[in-house]
Regions:
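Noncatalytic alpha-helical scaffold of FAD-dependent oxidoreductases
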Residues: 1-389
Length: 389
């Protein structure tokens, strides 16, 4: 088995050059701006490095966001860890999770799996482990199961389905409904149901210096917990990814940023939902942060390009003959005016289709029809751990 490493190349199709090799080292600007606005990736070549059988994962309890940030800084400054992320369950409870690949499990360390329907969801398991301890707890997880540890439950978005239907949320119901609770099924149901227009799905990157203030804001405004924490290493190359201009003491190295995953129900009224998202974008901007562009984006075009180097981006589109393709802004923006008009023109039947529980039931129907649960059942990562026994 192998893990993906950095480097390699991909091949993209653009209007000026049928096949354009894009080496990470030689053409880094292409990799950092593409978003299918420069061309369409048709072939990917990856550099690999040897993987190990297990990840020894350690859960470090924290009691505040400031403590979480300090631990993230410490753990990302060392080179003997392979993985670092974190979960804040509330303002006073969280865990920073570190991982180290190994073929040999340390003495006294037990193994844990997350692939079977009877297994716990990862985030619930971590919360359970740190509930009664003040010191780090370590266990070994088969590598493939660690890499897909958030698949069952879709991080914690799956709990929202239980909340929506007012259905009991416990070990028995999670086991019974396991087919519906993998990321692909949840994603399909969310969008088919129309609930994505009422659900906040945002990854937001900020300087460490303003991350705690931002979390205080999201708590007061949305009340969404848990939050996912993921440290981000910056690159000096211009990019369409989140970035900031804060430097380390040497004046050359860009400081890391912190990605905060904010996923949960927002205001149910459409106008209030848009307003809440716009306010979120303004607060993010105020604190020197940026959002990842996979998510709903409500910026005006002028606001959007204030965050990025438009001239540099357009020059690249000219260079690669990609001006006939939609720009990044055109791909990610939400047409607020069109959505508002559509809301106002809904028929009685259309309104009923978006109401509880009909929209949710329709989402489930479409998710079942997609048969993505069959792919989840056959996923190789779910059997990897059993091969190690």
């Amino acid at each position: 088995m192998f893990c993906v490493g950095l480097g390699g190349q991909d091949t993209s199709l653009s209007s000026s050059s049928p096949f354009l090799p894009c080496y990470v080292v030689k053409n880094p600007e292409f990799k950092l701006t593409n978003c299918c606005s420069m061309g369409v990736t048709t072939l990917v070549e990856l550099q690999l490095h040897d993987a190990k059988k297990y990840v020894e994962a350690t859960y470090h309890p924290v009691t505040s966001m400031s403590e979480a940030i300090q631990k993230l800084k410490v753990f990302t400054s060392t080179h003997d860890l392979d993985y670092v992320d974190g979960i804040m369950f509330s303002k006073t409870q969280g865990a920073i999770i570190t991982g180290r690949m190994t073929d040999t499990i340390s003495s006294g360390v037990t193994t844990q799996s997350f692939s079977d329907a009877k297994d716990p969801w990862f985030y619930l398991h971590v919360q359970d482990k740190i509930a009664s301890i003040t010191t780090p707890y370590t266990e070994a997880i088969p590598l493939a199961e660690y890499l897909f540890r958030y698949d069952r439950g879709g991080f914690w978005v799956g709990k929202s389905a239980f909340d929506y239907f007012k259905f009991p949320f416990n070990k028995l119901t999670r086991w019974w409904l396991d087919d519906f609770l993998h990321t692909r099924m949840l994603y399909t149901a969310l969008h088919a149901s129309g609930q994505s227009k009422k659900y906040v799905v945002q990854d937001l990157a900020l300087p460490y210096s303003t991350a705690e203030e931002f979390v205080n804001y999201t708590d007061e405004t949305f009340g969404i917990w848990p939050l996912w924490l993921c440290p981000l290493k910056q690159d000096s190359i211009p990019t369409m990814h989140p970035h900031s201009n804060e430097f380390e003491a040497d004046g050359k190295t860009l400081k890391q940023m912190l990605n905060i995953g904010l996923w949960g129900f927002g205001p149910q009224n459409h106008a209030d939902f848009i307003k809440a998202n716009r306010n979120l974008e303004h607060k993010l901007r105020e604190l020197g942060g940026m959002k990842w562009l996979y998510a709903h984006t409500y910026y005006s075009e002028n606001e959007f390009w204030q965050m990025f180097d438009r001239k540099w981006y357009n020059n690249l589109r000219e260079k690669y003959g990609a001006t006939s393709l939609p720009s990044v802004y055109e791909k990610v923006k939400v047409d607020i005016e069109a959505e508002t008009k559509a809301e106002g023109k809904k028929t009685l039947l259309g309104s009923l289709a978006t109401m509880w529980p009909f929209s949710g039931l329709y989402g489930i129907r479409k998710a079942i029809a997609s048969k993505t649960y069959l792919a989840a059942r056959k996923a190789e990562w779910r059997t990897y751990g059993k091969k190690l026994e």
